A protein has these predicted regions:
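Short, flexible loop/hinge motifs at secondary-structure junctions
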Residues: 1-174, 218, 247, 297
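Catalytic center-proximal scaffold of phosphoryl-transfer enzymes
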Residues: 3, 49, 154-157, 162-476
């Protein structure tokens, strides 16, 4: 340092000025480089954050989001459910009501007689004196064959010369046609068991020896759907009489394009509709704006905007799957605590109603849970995924704990997801619908069949009643 001072003292004034100007220029250049590096660092930080969020999205599966299980990568020993192990052994539990296929009045009895001679002393045995000591049954089906009824139109001529003709029954309109029971069976297999036309024609030929073309199957479906239209509308009426209704929608293929299959369902029935749209106009068209009960659903905007006078209940498993994602990917303590809180609220609701607590105590407990929820939602998130979820939950916080006020309202929308699952089964087997009418027809018939299941009715008998236009569901 002393050496530098001595050298500078030897320099002239002009030389010192040149050195200062040169250093100033170098400083300005370095500051410019620093500014460019800071901008580059800022850009790279944004890119890193975007890539981290993209990686997080790619790591989502059916356990940590609303994605279907079919989109999950193959993993060994992966738990796809939010349910915990119960600790019970598999199979029937002690005390459950037993069931048996044993028949009290068999169609045929075969006596398995012992030998006619004693194997010990050699004396003859009178088999008429034998007694039954044990029974075993074998269940079989009789040989299957088609049953053909021929209607012959008779004629007679009076002595005066007037010729009189008999009349065919009203339902016999063709020279050769399918009877109602056979039509019902075709509808049952195609809709309830999702058998495509080709496999259905093969099955009818193999089982019954009946050769049926695809057009005959389509005619049976169309006739049943047309005659079932009044009952189809009745299903929506009886659903809207219930205290709660669940709603959901999923994509399907119609004429090679993406359409949407909707469902509204309750304990009394299931209503399906097919539409090109996924917005609130579909709700107005099919569900209306006069529902008096509670609507259970995920957070899709069309459901959020649906008129439900008693309020909305958000599906907890949907929220919990997103919380599981935050726990798994971001190690988020807030998500863990909120997930635990939601599980506790579900148990608390059952407890305060099953243990006979007074209305005052129940109200106090519910208010405490609402206060705790508000405290959870005001905590600041540490990443964009958490902030997005918090923002949505804050907006819809009034519909997260609504179920606690009524023991009959579910905290989930699982029944709607089960109801809509058949659309995906249909898509995986058949790929979709070739026509709009085929899609609408399937929605009508599926509504009839799923409602019959919920009301404990025989599906085949229900389809026959729809064909004869005598079907009426309970509650409508």
């Amino acid at each position: 340092m002393e050496l530098v001072k001595k050298e500078l003292k030897k320099l002239s004034k002009n030389q010192l000025i040149e050195i200062i100007l040169l250093q100033d220029k170098q400083i300005q250049l370095q500051q410019k480089q620093i500014g460019m590096q800071q901008e580059q660092i800022k850009t790279q930080q944004g890119q890193i954050q975007a890539l981290e969020e993209r990686i997080a999205r790619l790591e989502k599966d059916s356990e940590t989001s609303s994605k279907p299980p079919s989109s999950d990568p193959n993993k060994a020993n992966r738990n796809q459910s939010l349910r915990k192990k119960s600790g019970k052994k598999p199979g029937g539990q002690p005390g459950h009501p037993g069931k048996t296929r044993y028949q009290e009045n068999p169609d045929k009895v075969v006596h398995c007689q012992p030998v006619a001679q004693c194997s010990d002393c050699g004396a003859g045995l009178d088999i008429t004196q034998s007694e039954c000591v044990e029974t075993r049954q074998e269940i079989d089906i009789p040989p299957i064959k088609s049953y053909v009824t021929e209607y012959q139109r008779m004629a007679i001529t009076c002595q005066c010369g007037q010729r009189h003709l008999g009349q065919f029954p009203d339902h016999v309109t063709a020279h050769l046609q399918l009877a109602q029971r056979l039509k019902s069976f075709l509808v049952y297999l195609n809709v309830a068991h999702v058998l495509p036309y080709t496999r259905l024609t093969q099955l009818m030929n193999d089982l019954f020896g009946i050769q049926i073309c695809k057009r005959s199957i389509e005619n049976a479906l169309e006739e049943t759907a047309t005659k079932a239209m009044p009952v189809y509308h009745q299903i929506m009426t009886l659903i809207k009489q219930c205290k709660w209704v669940g709603s959901d929608e999923t994509g399907c293929r119609v004429e090679g394009k993406r359409w949407w299959q909707w469902t509204w369902q309750s304990d009394l029935g299931s209503y399906y509709a097919i539409d090109q749209r996924r917005g609130y106009n579909v709700v107005k068209t099919h569900f209306g704006e006069d529902y008096q009960g509670t609507l259970c659903h995920d957070c899709w905007s069309a459901h959020n905007n649906t008129v439900a006078k008693s309020g909305h209940q958000q599906c907890h498993p949907h929220i919990q799957r997103e919380l599981m994602f935050l726990i798994k990917i971001h190690k988020c303590k807030w998500a863990y605590d909120l997930n635990t809180f939601l599980a506790a609220s579900q148990k608390a609701r059952d407890h305060i109603f099953s243990e006979g607590f007074s209305p005052e105590i129940r109200t106090s407990v519910i208010q405490q849970y609402h206060q705790k929820l508000k405290l959870f939602l005001v905590k600041n998130g540490t990443n964009n995924d958490t902030l997005r979820l918090q923002k949505r939950l804050i907006k819809h916080q009034h519909s997260i704990l609504l179920f606690m006020s009524d023991p009959h309202i579910p905290f989930h929308n699982n029944s709607s997801e089960r109801a809509i699952r058949m659309a995906k089964v249909k898509q995986k087997i058949s790929g979709g619908f070739r026509s709009r009418r085929g899609a609408q027809r399937h929605a009508i018939l599926l509504s009839i069949i799923e409602t019959a299941k919920k009301q404990g009715l025989n599906i085949l008998t229900t389809i026959q009643a729809a064909l004869s236009q005598s079907l009426v569901f309970a509650g409508g």
